Structures are given as C-alpha cells and as structure tokens.
A protein has these predicted regions:
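PLP-dependent class I/II
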Residues: 1-128
C-alpha cells in the first residue's frame, strides 16, 4: 500500500531534519556529472534550452536540456546517435521547445574524455 512509502518518506525526512542523515550526499555526484557534461556540450556549440526556472538558475541534477543550432529535437536525437550519444526529444516530455533531455545517470565522470571526443567529432562535422 502507499502507506508504507509515506512512512518511509516521513522517516527519511525526520532523520534529515534531525541531522542524522544528509539526503543530498547520495545525489551530489549527479550534480557533478551534469556540470561536467554541460560544460562539454556548450564547449562544442550546444546551447542549454532550460537554464532558468522563473528567474532562478536551474541547479545541476539528474538531467539537463540542450539544442544544437539548426536542428530540431527529433533530428538532433537521430544525429547524435551516430556519435554514440543518446538523449530524448523535449517534445516527448511535453515541452513546446525544440531540444533534447540528456540524462546523466549512465555517464560517470571517468567517461568525460570519451564524451568530449564524441562531441568534438560532432562539432567538426557540423560547424559551418
């Protein structure tokens, strides 16, 4: 039943409020990955689609959004697959904007050099 989940969540939040656990420790690595990946994507010509929520900068987390000039989200999804990079079109998430949602969970920090090489090749093939 849902009561079990609610009790578990209440216990986690209580422990966090009492200082017995730090609930951010488990997700900090995702922020580091997102930050590193965003730097690489923007270095090679990609733009961040959603960088603010109202007036506040969006924190680095489990995913981020990108677009490459001249592409729709669907076309970019297909094109980056040729370079061994995957993401989903923003339209599949309900967005009206063109772009991709890139998830950081499967890309560990030790794979950033590999990602950079792939992005470098993509940019070289698509720079006008």
């Amino acid at each position: 039943t849902t009561h079990s989940c609610q009790y578990a969540m209440a216990a986690i939040l209580k422990a966090a409020n009492e200082g017995r656990i730090n609930i951010l420790d488990g997700v900090r690595e995702y922020a580091e990955r997102a930050h590193a990946m965003k730097e690489l994507f923007t270095k090679y010509g990609f733009e961040i689609v959603y960088d603010r929520d109202l007036e506040e900068p969006i924190a680095d987390g489990f995913y981020f959004t990108i677009i490459y000039p001249g592409f729709t989200g669907g076309d970019l999804t297909k094109e980056i697959l040729y370079y061994g990079i995957s993401a989903i079109p923003l339209r599949d998430t309900g967005s009206k904007k063109q772009g991709l949602r890139a998830c950081v969970s499967q890309t560990e920090l030790n794979r950033m050099p590999e990602l950079e090489e792939r992005l470098k090749r993509f940019a070289a093939d698509h720079t006008k």
